[in-house]
Amino acid sequence: MRRAINLINRNPRPYDIAADQSSLLFSSLPYDVVLNCLARVSRRYYPNLSCVSKSFQSLVRSPELAHMRSLIGKDDPVVYVCFSDTKPFLGRRLDWFTLNPNEKKTSVLNSFQVFSYYMLYCPSVSIGSKIYFVGGCMYKCLPGLLIFDSWSGELCVGPSMKEARMLPGVAVVNGKLYVMGGCREDQIQVEVFDPNSQTWEVGPLSSDGEVRYGKGLMRYGAIVTEAVALEGKVYCMSYKDGSHIIYDTKDGKCETFLMADGKAWRRGGVCVVNSVIYVYYINLGVMWYDPKDKVWREVKGLNKLDYKSIDMVGMVDCNGKLGFLWGNNTREIISGRTEKRIWCEMIVLERSGVEIHGTVEWSDLVGFVPHDYEIWRCLGVSY
């Protein structure tokens, strides 16, 4: 046990690790006792524990440990931030970093090269500890599904969709993935993936409503840059002006809605916190959508960031608070490498009538990344 404590305190001594037999004693304890002990250790130390032995590595990646953490209330969500470099498509890669909002520190997750560079810009969503990559990116239709288990670190290929899709809208409703558009109008417009049965089925699509998905405004299927779910409906934000739609998962009816500036939505921070949709505009700040009046309203009490000093931002739900991340454009030489800072604010949101006020609970520097990296996606992952 002392050997594990040495590692946790970041003070391992090679000769102690080589000679100390305490790990054998620890391993000889009943399996449930070992799991209970490890479950009470912060996940930030698991990479160190994995280096102790193969048995430790197996334990910290086991689903039983994840379940034990959940039982004792240690399954706090962790934010996974995806960064993309700005190299040409063929040379690009995804790099993931983790942020524990309680510890305000980042740690590098083992980065992985995607199987196909076309998967780089495909939509991604999270359910529990797993991250799902769906379809293809711009100019490339793919039916593929990749599943990354953030607990075990494994990336595997899931069942393919019935249709190949380019930048479909993807959101999670009642534990299922709803995938919309990104294909021709004569193809299946909506597919639903059930993670439990690992099967795809055709989603409902009604001819009633303001617009039919895949017809009219959506003739060639939406090329969606962001999608979020709220109260059984999927809100799809498109690259095309006037093509932002709301899809009802119950009956397949669709209606259009406008973004805050009435234009196409390129990319930026979007998330749902406490059943409210939030977006970030450089020139408008943090906005929220009022579905009753069908209008966007500004979140009061927050200062706008200087658009000249930031690049792409990320937003994520952190236990009912709004996690807001951004990188600055200032380059710094750190340990001989050119890097830039990544900042995070934790915002408490309070609603009063038709107004929502935001209060910054804390704001801090949380890490550094190479200067050519951009925030591409923020996902809340639970264990």
UniProtKB/Swiss-Prot annotation:
Positions annotated as Kelch repeat: 130-175, 176-220, 269-317
InterPro entries: F-box-like_dom_sf, F-box/kelch-repeat_ARATH, F-box_dom, Kelch-typ_b-propeller, Kelch_1
A Pfam short name: Kelch_FKB95
Keyword DNA damage (UniProt): no
Residue stretches making up the F-box domain: 23-71
Gene3D superfamilies xrefs: Kelch-type beta propeller
Protein name: F-box/kelch-repeat protein At2g22030
Organism: Arabidopsis thaliana (Mouse-ear cress)
Lineage summary: Eukaryota, Viridiplantae, Streptophyta, Embryophyta, Tracheophyta
